[in-house]
Design a protein with these regions (language model features):
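Conserved histidines in hydrophobic membrane contexts and catalytic metal-binding motifs
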Residues: 2-403
Length: 403
């Protein structure tokens, strides 16, 4: 209530547009800066593989000459002998004879922490050195996912980033509503007016860039929520693949506990590898062989066709850990689109699922998030500066505007 000359007047009820506008800038002053940090770290991780490959270019190459590569079990045994108690969990091999092997170790059974990965010579098993920048990108990933707050995925950091991801969807919805023109002119809607001075220029840049990037941010937000909220992931799984997919166990090694491996034999791995190389492996480019152990109860071979780099085209075959007999295979070409999206949710999140051009677009969109925080803060400050003189001139100190 406002009191003026003894008369009580009710405060005007703000319009929906005013409420949404205040919600937009209030979230911008809070969640906006967390999203800016998530955008920067996400953009950096968009090209993690390329950056890591450049930093390790000397360790990723070996001299093949006329040497014959070791069988997987022999290669793993030689690496284990140099690893100081660490056990090889997976080998990534290439059809390029001059490419080194990428070696991932099994998690520590007590701490569940995975030791640093290394590169190794596939011909003699010599360890060429650890993967440079792996630890740095692990820190960037933790910063992106839960802000390095103690507790990791079970702490408050995941709650905060999940809430900020929801805020991004609110930004998109309220921004489009507030910007929806009374006069529909595509030139005004899609082209920024940078020649206008002051607040109009910043508003035009903020609004037009947001309009262009709305589809990208929507994909980023919706896929990001699958890591933040299990219920949302279950709903997305049901929508994309049907209810039967929800009952399947986790496919990724290290996610949950697998059943113990009964009577696993080293020669079974070599049999499975030989069968794969004689069959579908003839057209394989990059192959990841996951050995049976505490994390995986079968021999799993995942591969990309020769000349293909997108993980969304990855195929998979499974073999019995005791005999090396073929169990099942799954090919990307035969997988329905919904399941492809679920199995490559990270690639969708990064834009690589749609091709290299979209990967670059998603990276640039992530880099633009700090720009939205900066322009939004600039608009807020300029608006507050313009509002204070108006309040001083208004009778009784009342603001002439509801915003």
């Amino acid at each position: 209530l406002r009191y003026a000359a003894g008369i009580v007047k009710p405060l005007p009820i703000p319009s929906p547009r005013t409420v949404l506008f205040r919600l937009h800038w209030a979230l911008g002053l809070t969640a906006g800066f967390v999203l800016a940090l998530m955008g920067l770290t996400g953009a950096l991780m968009s090209y993690e593989e390329a950056i890591t490959a450049f930093a390790n270019r000397d360790r990723m190459r070996v001299e093949a000459a006329d040497r014959v590569p070791l069988a997987p079990t022999a290669l793993a045994a030689r690496i284990d002998a140099q690893a100081g108690g660490r056990i090889v969990n997976a080998l990534t091999l290439s059809d390029d004879p001059n490419a080194s092997a990428f070696v991932r170790f099994a998690r520590d059974p007590e701490t569940r922490v995975r030791p640093p990965s290394v590169y190794a010579d596939p011909y003699d098993g010599a360890v060429l050195g650890p993967v440079r920048l792996e630890a740095a990108f692990a820190t960037v990933r933790d910063l992106h996912r839960w802000l390095l707050i103690p507790g990791g995925s079970k702490g408050w950091g995941r709650t905060i980033t999940g809430a900020c991801t929801l805020a991004l969807i609110v930004f998109l919805a309220t921004g489009l509503y507030l910007r929806w023109p009374k006069i529909h002119r595509w030139r005004i809607w899609l082209k920024p007016s940078l020649s206008r001075p002051g607040r109009p220029r910043w508003w035009s840049l903020h609004a037009v860039a947001g309009t262009w990037l709305t589809p990208v941010y929507l994909v980023i937000a919706l896929t990001g929520l699958t890591w933040s909220y299990p219920a949302f992931k279950d709903g997305a799984t049901w929508l994309l693949a049907g209810p039967s997919e929800r009952a399947k166990p986790a496919r990724m090694a290290g996610h949950g506990e697998a059943s113990p491996v009964p009577d696993s034999r080293p020669d079974a791995v070599d049999r499975a590898w030989a069968a794969f190389r004689a069959g579908e492996g003839q057209e394989a480019g990059v192959v990841t062989l996951t050995l049976p152990g505490a994390d995986t109860a079968t021999i799993r071979i995942r591969w990309l066709p020769r000349g293909v780099a997108s993980l969304s085209a990855r195929n998979e075959a499974r073999y019995d850990a005791a005999t090396g007999a073929f169990l099942s295979a799954e090919h990307a070409a035969d997988t329905p689109l919904g399941r492809q999206i679920l199995q490559s949710i990270l690639e969708v999140h990064r834009g690589r699922f749609f091709g290299d051009l979209f990967a670059l677009l998603f990276c640039l969109a992530a880099l633009a998030m700090p720009g939205f925080a900066a322009t939004g803060l600039t608009l807020y400050i300029l608006r507050r500066r313009a509002t204070v003189p108006c309040r001083r001139r208004a009778p009784g100190g009342a603001s002439p505007r509801g915003g």
